[in-house]
Amino acid sequence: MALPLLPGFSLGRNVGKEKFHKSQHWGYCNNVAMLLAEDKPGIGGEPLPGQKLIPKSSVFPAELGCGAPAWLAFDKQVLSFDAYFEEEVPDKNQEPYRIRHCKIYFYLEDDTIQVLEPQVKNSGIIQGTIVRRHRIPLPSPNEDQFYTIDHFNINAEVIFYARRYKIIDCDQFTKHFLRKMGFKLNPPGNRPDDPYTKERQKILDSMNPLRPYERIDTLKQFLEHDGHVLRFYCVWDDPESLFHDPRELVLHYYLSDDTIDIKEVIPVNSGRDVVPLFLRRDKLPKYAPTGLYQPGTITSRTVLNVFGNLVGNRGRYILDNRKTGAVHQEFYRDSDLKIGAVINVWGRQIMLCDCDEFTKDYYRTKYGIEDFTPVPYKAPPPPKAEKPIPPYTGFGSEEDSLCSCMSLLPKPPQKDFKKFMEKDRCGLESNTLRFLAKLVTDSPIDKDRKFIICYFLMMPLYSVFEHSQRNTGIIGGKFLEKGRIKKPGQELFKSEPSEYFKAQDLFIGARVCFHGHNFLLVDADEYTINYMEKHANEFAVADTGFIFKKLKDIAEPRSREIRQVFAAADPQHTKVIEYDPFRNLIVSITDGAFSEHEIMTLGRHYGEKEEYEIDHHFLLAKAQEQLKKNSFENFEQLSTILVYNDREKCGALPYETCRTICKSFKLPLSDDLLQTILTMFEDDHKQVNYKKFVDAVNWREHQIPSFHTIKLPPKNEDDWNGQPPFLPVKRIKYLPLLDDLFGKEE
């Protein structure tokens, strides 16, 4: 007995309820008030007492969270069933019924069904779509309902519009989906064969034609060699021409169908008309021309009339396997083409003289031919006549005067824009070479004057500045404005272009003459020396390999004497000597054949490098400061990913793996700082201890007090005052130099 609906004795039935609408049960039909539907629910969509609602579409299990609707969750997902149905064949004793196989597709998004019948050869039935895609109602008396996913299973029958379909199997996706839905699948059924089709197949298999048609299949050759073309360069000596001038041709052999086309190379101003093709693409017969054949003479098959005109006007035609009276033609194949061969192109003798690289690889691979020596078929081109250039007039620059002589309309000279963009100043790269120079003179006043020679790489221009000195009576500043400088000893009015000073003419120890002033280059700034060493292929005085070879050729005959000289310069046996004694020894050994720049390059190569110790504490503090400024706190997730990539669980990962993971996390550290910190935690096997690395940069748990960076004034290269820089190499390790020159002493 149910409890009465008294306050405090009943639960709140409307708790969590959102729908409170009433269904429309009554209405008008032909202006008559009547009950329209008895299956409509009550208030809020809840069923009435004793009412059982039947879902109008398939009901799928609810997913976790907010599930998507069926039309979105099951978009483009289809269940496929293999089925068949029996069809009666009236008035035919040989075929009382027919088995027709079909496919049933159930679309999960909207419960629509489609039935397709695959094509069967010579069936005589219109096949394809039997039932178009739509929702199919159930058979009577439930025609007000539609088929859903619950009505389908293996070895089950469905009725579509009075036609009974037997489902025998389904695909793997359908089986997996139905199992997930909770269906218990039946075992697959047998696929029955159509008796009449089976009988017809037996008859066809028993038939053995005595004269089968010859199979001509070129599909394989087309698929293997489509787009593969052999190219030969040919020549044809036309005997009908007046001067028997050779005609250059290009022959293309198409491997996909063994056809050939030929194009003629028309020289410029030859007087010949340009035609698209010398020979259109087709198979080329070897023995041609042989006359014209009547239509039907050349066919792919030969047919015989067995009875002729004996039986009225009706004949009996069969295939002639012996091909009596057939015309056989031989065509050029790829095996007939080779360099030096002469082929017949419809009566014209054409010689194959050369081929391209693809053709050589093809013949080398297929036929094993290695000799591809081309046949010379044309004389070398005559040397191009040089255009006489008038001498320089003295007005404007030489390039401007030369451009006015090249064409009727004068054009301005073209500048090297690419070099300008590559060598233009970019950030700290000034692309300017600076040298300290002195005047070569006997004047006691001019001897002490110092000049800075600047060479701008973006445009080959020079500028000279004089360094101002106190109590000299000479005002410093610009000595020579920016511009090009000609080498001395050249005529002014001449046809040949003048020679100008280049970057290769400037090095420490060089003597240059700028407009009558002789300069001796005595020093250079650090940027210039580094630039010349970095581009050693352009500057021979900064090429260590070239200098070493030059020194070895001079010093090799006196190896023992040179070892004794260097040993005498190092009485304490420290294996190093100062730069000045080293320079004096090289000058004495080479008898002045080496310039100051070459000696300095050699000293920089074998000099002692000052090693700077890295302050790990300072680097970690800088790294934590950068991470803190960028609010990076995903250290736990970073550690988890590093542990996940550690398959061997050894606590270490390769350097590149750690760097890649840090980059994928967008760790806000500069690349050089990240590489340095990772190197700090490497072991002997180049493995990084990632746990220590994460703990070191974790500013939340292991914070390191920050350092106060001392801001130094930025060094500007343009402020170089010409004073000799701090010598970058003080001590030279001479033993490695001697070992490289003469080998290790035993």
Swiss-Prot record:
<feature type="domain" description="EF-hand">
    <location>
        <begin position="557"/>
        <end position="592"/>
    </location>
</feature>
<dbReference type="GO" id="GO:0005879">
    <property type="term" value="C:axonemal microtubule"/>
</dbReference>
<keyword id="KW-0966">Cell projection</keyword>
<dbReference type="InterPro" id="IPR011992">
    <property type="entry name" value="EF-hand-dom_pair"/>
</dbReference>
<comment type="function">
    <text>Microtubule inner protein (MIP) part of the dynein-decorated doublet microtubules (DMTs) in cilia axoneme, which is required for motile cilia beating.</text>
</comment>
<keyword id="KW-0677">Repeat</keyword>
<feature type="domain" description="DM10 3">
    <location>
        <begin position="429"/>
        <end position="536"/>
    </location>
</feature>
<feature type="domain" description="DM10 1">
    <location>
        <begin position="75"/>
        <end position="182"/>
    </location>
</feature>
<dbReference type="InterPro" id="IPR040193">
    <property type="entry name" value="EFHC1/EFHC2/EFHB"/>
</dbReference>
<keyword id="KW-0963">Cytoplasm</keyword>
<dbReference type="InterPro" id="IPR006602">
    <property type="entry name" value="DM10_dom"/>
</dbReference>
<protein>
    <recommendedName>
        <fullName>EF-hand domain-containing family member C2</fullName>
    </recommendedName>
</protein>
<dbReference type="GO" id="GO:0010975">
    <property type="term" value="P:regulation of neuron projection development"/>
</dbReference>
<dbReference type="Pfam" id="PF06565">
    <property type="entry name" value="DM10_dom"/>
</dbReference>
<keyword id="KW-0206">Cytoskeleton</keyword>
<feature type="domain" description="DM10 2">
    <location>
        <begin position="226"/>
        <end position="367"/>
    </location>
</feature>
